[in-house]
Amino acid sequence: MKDRILNRGGSDHTIMKISDKKVLVTGAGGFIGSHLCEELVKSEARVRAMVRYNSSESHGLLEGLPRELYNRLEIVSGDIRDIDSVTKAVSGCDIVFHLAALIGIPYSYHAPKSYVDTNVVGTLNVMQACRQESVERVIHTSTSEVYGTAMYIPIDEHHPLQGQSPYSASKIAADKIAESYYLSFNLPVVTIRPFNCYGPRQSSRAFIPAMVSQLLSESVIKCGYLAPQRDYTFVKDTVAGFIAAALVPGIEGMTINVGTGKKISMGDLLQRIMSRMDLMKQILPEESRLRPPKSEVMALICDNTRARAFLGWEPGYTLDQGLDEVVSFVKSNSNRYKTDHFVV
């Protein structure tokens, strides 16, 4: 992948340009995907949102968008494992944001093949369809989990990759499929590698909303291992990185980390959440919420030099500002959250 570093303009300029584009978002019903669709519609892009077909005809987290924005989406159902539905969804689009994936790390220990089918074969289908339809730019979504336990921090894009779970291994393979389509076929791919992302609408599978939900309703807080360190980025900042990556010229073939560069342990984060909520409760780590020892990733801290230099990107939300938004959302939507649903 390319290693050149250039100075680029800021995000305000690039967001205005998205209004010229017809875009596809795969995984649109997910957490980041729904926020990306929301921002794209606000920015006057013509948005086709691909959600996984289901018998209830649910559109996932897109249904939480304000109605006036939701109604401006072109929603299509399909499955990225099916090349025909992917090709149909890609047809006529200028830019493709590929976010669809199986993301739960714990389930990958039990059903690794399903992660290969969706994350690897699905990504292959998206790249092939984009090549066939001659799209202008493909934004492929990676994850900081591909780095495994850090050999050094902060982690830059040159850090070795290590598959410490079947999930992360499948994402490494997907990243390499995307890279191969750039190198072999000159497909204009940019890979965005987000570090831990959080914000409103995130499910209780994730640490922050799970802890907020428990604090609101339980006397004892059940959690997993609290020593690992993470770099948490508010979802609106992550989305700004995606949009900039779609529009900044000359960055095809690059992988770009998106994260704040600030570290916090899970234990300190839980204390920070309790402080913001003014609620102090007993903490009880549970073995069932722990990863296998060799699979645990102890530190994921972002070096965002490349995002700042190439995309003109920088985080706009402090951790406290973002936590306050999550707390407000969970309080207003407590019926959506199960306090026993948190997974590692």
Where are the regions a protein language model picked out?
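N-terminal Rossmann-like NAD(P)+-binding domain of SDR-like oxidoreductases, especially those catalyzing
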Residues: 3-197, 325, 329-333, 342-344
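A short C-terminal helix-loop "cap" of Rossmann-like NAD(P)-dependent dehydrogenase/epimerase domains
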Residues: 67-73, 185-188, 212-222, 248, ...
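Residue-level signal for the nucleotide or nucleotide-sugar donor/cofactor binding architecture
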Residues: 81, 110, 118, 165, ...
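Glycine/proline-rich active-site loop of Rossmann-fold NAD(P)-dependent oxidoreductases
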Residues: 172, 197-210, 219, 235-236, ...
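Hydrophobic alpha-helix immediately C-terminal to the catalytic Tyr-X-X-X-Lys motif of short-chain
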Residues: 173, 177, 181, 211, ...
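C-terminal "lid/loop" region of Rossmann-like NAD(P)-dependent oxidoreductases
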Residues: 225, 253-256, 267-270, 278-299, ...
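Conserved C-terminal active-site "lid" loop/helix of NAD(P)H-dependent oxidoreductases
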Residues: 235, 255, 290-314, 325
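Non-catalytic, hydrophobic alpha-helical segments
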Residues: 238, 242, 258, 269, ...
